[in-house]
């Protein structure tokens, strides 16, 4: 179980929404090869640690509210157990830990409307929350064998957290939306001694916006810091009339619901062997997904990127897969012209192209032919590239 954090961000929120939990039947994506720093598909169990600051005097109300919702949470697919604890030293500090079969069912739950409705009774009792999410690597329990197969090796990363937000604007307002999102004043990148906003990349396709952020340190802290910046607040307010989903940023519940529905977590990130003199270009790809095929396509792209990370000569320097429901976006840093290597840039090289045919609705973007054909891949790349609006990096990132 988890409770949504206090909503505030450059384009706030944390983590995912409803994803079909396919991990039980799909093979795990290897992560012990170099380069993979994020993977929701490695098959390991997940431990969620939620720290809560409860209003003093409302401890009993909080406990009663938890009692009312605990059975509903226990029935969520993929949920294994949870444990509610109160601090020995400070009665306002509580800890809620939960275990999940894997990341996929947790991400399907944490930012869904169902989750918000379930935990709403707790909200009035809680001043603040902070959520931490971990893959279980090893477990020791009195000599009894631990369930599941542990990952053979830890992932190695660069202390960078990646997250994305997606939303749609009313048809006919795309030009003004693009102008607002291209011209806003950059927020102060420095958050505190351990957290810094590194990069914000915005893209548009039709009336859909995708905003991807990279943070060194704590994501929630950075997003809250950014949300307080006057320039960011001004552009968020200016966007309100154009949004297809109404929101009131002055109403915490309205803001929380908007950013919950907009959250699109990074489910896989791979960095490839860097090359000096590489001509980096960043692009975002919005894949046309058949109904219900989003989870399988995200897993396929993750598997392709994990395999490609072993190739030091490929054109892709880094790739991040963002996923929610049937929305799959892949953020790719490429060395050179992307159209020189469409299969690799799309993540549909080798067997991946044939495997993707049943998952992609290429005709929806005006592309005929099989993804296994080179000409089809070239056309597909041109049609699913999102239009870049802005790509801002902080000094030293």
From Swiss-Prot:
Residues 8-22 have a biased composition (Low complexity). Transmembrane segments: none annotated. Residues 46-137 form the ABM domain. InterPro entries: ABM_dom, Dimeric_a/b-barrel, SchA_CurD-like. Residues 1-22 are annotated as: Disordered. Belongs to the SchA/CurD family. This is 42.8 kDa protein in whiE locus. It comes from Streptomyces coelicolor (strain ATCC BAA-471 / A3(2) / M145).
């Amino acid at each position: 179980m988890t409770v949504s954090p206090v909503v505030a961000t450059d384009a706030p929120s944390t983590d995912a929404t409803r994803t079909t939990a396919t991990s039980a039947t799909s093979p795990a994506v290897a992560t012990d090869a170099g380069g993979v720093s994020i993977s929701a598909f490695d098959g390991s169990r997940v431990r969620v640690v939620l720290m809560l600051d409860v209003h003093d005097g409302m401890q009993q109300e909080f406990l009663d509210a938890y009692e009312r919702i605990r059975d509903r949470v226990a029935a969520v697919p993929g949920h294994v157990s949870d444990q509610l604890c109160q601090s020995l030293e400070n009665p306002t500090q509580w800890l809620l830990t939960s275990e999940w079969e894997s990341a996929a069912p947790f991400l399907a739950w944490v930012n869904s409307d169902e989750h918000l409705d379930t935990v709403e009774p707790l909200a009035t009792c809680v001043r603040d929350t902070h959520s931490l999410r971990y893959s279980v690597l090893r477990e020791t329990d009195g000599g009894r064998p631990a369930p599941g197969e542990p990952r053979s090796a830890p992932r190695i990363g660069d202390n960078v957290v990646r997250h994305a937000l997606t939303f749609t604007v009313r048809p006919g307002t795309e030009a003004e939306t693009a102008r607002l999102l291209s011209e806003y004043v950059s927020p102060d990148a420095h958050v505190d001694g351990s957290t810094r906003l590194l990069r914000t990349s915005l893209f548009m396709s039709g009336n859909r916006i995708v905003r991807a952020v990279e943070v060194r340190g704590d994501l929630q802290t950075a997003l809250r810091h950014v949300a307080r910046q006057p320039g960011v607040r001004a552009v968020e307010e200016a966007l309100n009339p154009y949004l297809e989903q109404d929101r009131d940023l002055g109403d915490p519940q309205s803001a929380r619901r908007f950013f919950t529905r907009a959250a699109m977590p990074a489910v896989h990130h791979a960095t490839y062997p860097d090359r000096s003199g590489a001509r980096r270009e960043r692009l975002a790809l919005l894949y046309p997904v058949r109904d219900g095929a989003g989870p399988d396509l995200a897993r396929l792209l993750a598997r392709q990127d994990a395999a490609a990370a072993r190739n030091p000569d490929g054109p892709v320097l880094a790739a991040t897969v963002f996923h929610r429901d049937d929305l799959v976006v892949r953020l790719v840093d490429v060395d050179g012209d992307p159209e020189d290597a469409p299969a690799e840039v799309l993540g549909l090289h080798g067997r991946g192209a044939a495997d993707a045919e049943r998952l992609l609705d290429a005709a929806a973007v005006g592309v005929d032919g099989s993804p296994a054909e080179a000409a089809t891949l070239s056309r597909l790349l041109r049609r699913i590239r999102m239009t870049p609006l802005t790509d801002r990096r902080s000094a030293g990132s």
